[in-house]
Amino acid sequence: MHPAPTDTRPRRSSPWLSALLLAILVGAVGGLVAWGLAGVPSGSNTADPGEGADFGPSRIVVDTPQLRAAKDEAGIEPCAPGPGTEPAEDGLPSLVLPCLGGGAGVDVASLRGPMVVNLWAEWCPPCARELPIYADFHDAHGDRVPVLGVNWSDPKPVAAIRMLGEHGATYPQLADTEVALSSPLRVRGMPVLVLIDADGAIAYNRAVEITSLEQLEGLVREHLGVEL
């Protein structure tokens, strides 16, 4: 009695099995992507900046005759350096940012508080919603706690300046065209609120939408010790 011959031909995989494996693979990749996005730390109602910090060399120009005219029309105040002569411990790095709409650049390491710094962008809906609140804070408390805006990697600087004018935000504005603050401030979304104390140290840094003047006043009181 001879044993039954063994079939040595390679078995073909079933089409439905291949499709099932492909679906599992796609689902796993999608899950990892979703997990990564969900793990981004930010405050409520913040806008994702897109591809993160690696934008490559910037081609954004923030000083042209058109931008200077728009800045004058919006009534935006000129940029001014802070009193610091060297970077503060736990403060901003030595980094010169240009003034949005023309004017002298500022080394952010020179900034001393108490000061409110708002990173924002024209493409960010939460930023537009909170701009009037920063404008109100500037009008009410700017003599004691100055407000400084930092326009973050905005491809349309003229639209950004016009948006400031529409919301009455006249406080000085720097421009981070190279997203240079992305790493030191760990920027993961817009808008961002940074509070700087009298020594130049960062007392508060969070991606968060400010929804009321009282909220902003409370944060300044809590983290900078200023009674408003």
Predicted regions and their residues:
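Sequence contexts marking disulfide-bonded cysteines in secreted/extracellular proteins
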Residues: I76-G82, P98-L100, P125-A128
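N-terminal targeting signals for export/organelle localization
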Residues: M1-S94
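Structural microenvironment flanking redox-active thiols in thiol-disulfide oxidoreductases
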Residues: A128-H167, T177-S183
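A generic structural signal for alpha->beta connector loops
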Residues: G113, R144-V145, T170-Y171
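Short active-site neighborhood of thiol/selenol oxidoreductases, capturing the structured segment around
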Residues: G105-A128, Y134, V147
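Thiol/disulfide oxidoreductase modules built on the thioredoxin-like
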Residues: P15, R162-A169, D176-L228
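Soluble periplasmic/extracytoplasmic beta-strand elements of cell-envelope proteins
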Residues: V96, G149-N151, V194
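A short beta-strand-turn-helix
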Residues: G84-E89, S94-M115
